[in-house]
A protein has these predicted regions:
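Intrinsically disordered, low-complexity non-transmembrane regions of multi-pass membrane transporters
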Residues: 1-5, 12, 198-243, 295-299, ...
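Entry/N-cap segments of selected transmembrane alpha helices
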Residues: 93-124, 181, 245, 249, ...
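Hydrophobic transmembrane alpha-helices of secondary-active transporters
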Residues: 18, 45-52, 70-102, 284-294, ...
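Juxtamembrane helix-boundary/capping and inter-helix hinge elements in multi-pass membrane proteins
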Residues: 31-34, 91-105, 131-140, 162-175, ...
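C-terminal transmembrane helix pair
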Residues: 319-322, 327-329, 339, 344-452
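Alpha-helical membrane segments and immediately flanking helix-loop junctions
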Residues: 118, 126, 134-170, 195, ...
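Interfacial helix-loop-helix linkers and transmembrane-helix boundary segments
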Residues: 29-36, 60-73, 90-110, 295-309, ...
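Transmembrane helical segments that form the transport core of multi-pass membrane transport proteins
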Residues: 249-357
Length: 456
């Protein structure tokens, strides 16, 4: 049985330890409270240095066994895909209707696609120019992963990069993509938090900002203040409610895997790699079908939204921490300088676009722009953390808009998300797809009257 702990159970143990360390540091250190760094980010950064120093492993009867970054990359992939099963089971919260909310959600979805396109072109352009001027043996298409890493986060980036490496034998895509995603979290906090407070001082916010509660800053609830986070839908004499929800998600994930294998074995070469690479999409698809069927047979009450959110949130925390430990510094050395340049230029471009369109938004411009900056450098959670600074009680509808925007993005973002796996195909017009999105988006927003005179 000893051998079964290596490498994945040992890796999960390390992730858990770093999450606990991150939780303690967030609760005690003012710097991390000021910049709202979550425990998963703090723990991941620590884990990154421990792993790349060669200290990370587990003891065994034959001695110390080192755990490699590949193990954590694999864990990242599965946590991301499993979390999407939970997303598919979730129902949108009530109160998401209304003209302003729908317009705001569409506004965010359009800028989301624009930012991905601009970031990707900045990354690719930087890698191309560097290789032209200084040479190097690396695939410049990996620069496109700046857009995926910043805008879509580590899980989706992992999916794209895995397809590139397994189907087209592109080297170092996974490492570069995860590094872009990891640095994006830092950008969201280091740039986004000062921007939020600057906006408050300048009076750019729509509502009067309040003081953030200590429990929010520390990341730990006060003694006696323990809100309920789930409802039981089964009797514990039969099956625990959390076990029941996990059973549903595990079954759906298994179905997604089976479908992915079928795709891999039956589809033509070149697109068959999407079978496993897009397992997160298949999982979400089967989860949405399962939810519809349960509603049809009057069983939907057995799915508790809060339980599903907690399980999905747990996968995200473990995933973010694992992302940093999936990065190998040695493999980044060849592209280190263009990588840093791309991150800086991409961050500046993201900041400019968010503020430019935010100033001209029909309403709640700063809140939308700030939230989008966090979203399109980190994750949706990063964006909502920044929003909480300027809108502590979520009096504006922006938080709801962020959730609803996925409805629009599901349709609007398809040309990009379904094209990214084919970037390594010679002659594939990925660059021109990004150019088209970049040109069409502002024109569309203008005709939809989403661009007004600057409000701040």
């Amino acid at each position: 049985m000893e051998s079964t702990f290596y490498p994945y159970l040992g890796a999960l143990g390390w992730i858990g330890l770093f999450l606990l360390i991150g939780t303690i540091i967030r609760a005690k250190v003012k710097f991390f409270q000021t910049f709202l760094f979550p425990a998963s980010l703090i723990g991941g950064i620590i884990g990154f240095f421990v792993l790349n120093a060669g200290w990370l492993g587990i003891p065994s009867s034959t001695g110390w066994k080192t755990i490699t970054p590949v193990t954590f990359s694999t864990i990242t992939f599965h946590l991301f895909a499993f979390g999407f099963v939970g997303i598919g089971l979730l129902q949108a919260k009530s109160g998401t209707s209304g003209k302003v909310v729908a317009r705001g959600a569409l506004w965010i979805a359009l800028i989301f696609g624009l930012l991905f396109s601009v970031q990707a072109m900045v990354g690719k352009g930087t890698f191309d120019v560097w290789k032209l001027l200084f040479g190097g043996d690396f695939f410049t298409g990996n620069g496109y992963l700046l857009g995926a890493g910043f805008t879509q986060g580590p899980g989706q980036t992992q999916a794209y990069a895995s397809i590139w490496e397994t189907t087209y034998q592109i080297s170092n895509s996974l490492n570069v993509g995860l590094a872009f995603a990891a640095v994006g979290f830092l950008v969201a906090g280091i740039v986004g938090v000062p921007l939020a407070f600057y906006g408050i001082r300048k009076g750019w916010i729509s509502v009067e900002g309040g003081k953030l509660p200590n429990c929010f800053l520390r990341g730990l609830m006060d003694k006696g203040d323990n809100p309920t986070c789930a409802r039981s839908t089964t009797h514990p004499a039969n099956i625990d409610s959390v076990a029941f929800h996990l059973a549903i998600m595990a079954t759906l994930y298994a179905l997604a895997y089976a479908f992915g294998v079928w795709w891999l074995c039956t589809m033509p070469k070149g697109i068959n790699g999407l079978g496993i690479g897009m397992i997160f999409a298949w999982g979400m698809f089967f989860a949405m079908i399962a939810r519809k069927l349960m509603a049809k047979f009057d069983l939907i009450h057995l799915i508790d939204g809060e339980t599903t959110r907690r399980l999905t949130g747990a996968t995200v925390d473990f995933m973010i921490c694992a992302v940093f430990m999936g990065i190998q510094v040695r493999q980044l050395q060849e592209v280190a300088i263009p990588f840093v340049i791309a991150v800086v230029l991409g961050s500046l471009a993201t900041l400019f676009i968010c503020l430019w369109f935010g100033r001209r938004s029909p309403e709640h411009g700063f809140e939308r722009g700030l939230t989008l900056f966090g979203y399109c450098t980190g994750t949706a959670a990063s964006g909502l953390l920044l929003l909480r600074i300027v809108d502590p009680d979520f009096d504006t509808p922006v938080a709801v808009e962020v959730g609803l925007m996925n409805v629009f993005a599901t349709i609007l973002f398809k040309p990009i998300s379904w094209s990214m796996p084919f970037v390594p195909v010679e002659g594939f017009p990925m660059f021109w797809i990004f150019v088209a999105v970049t040109l069409i988006t502002p024109i569309t927003m203008y005709f939809l009257k989403m661009i007004k005179k600057p409000a701040f």
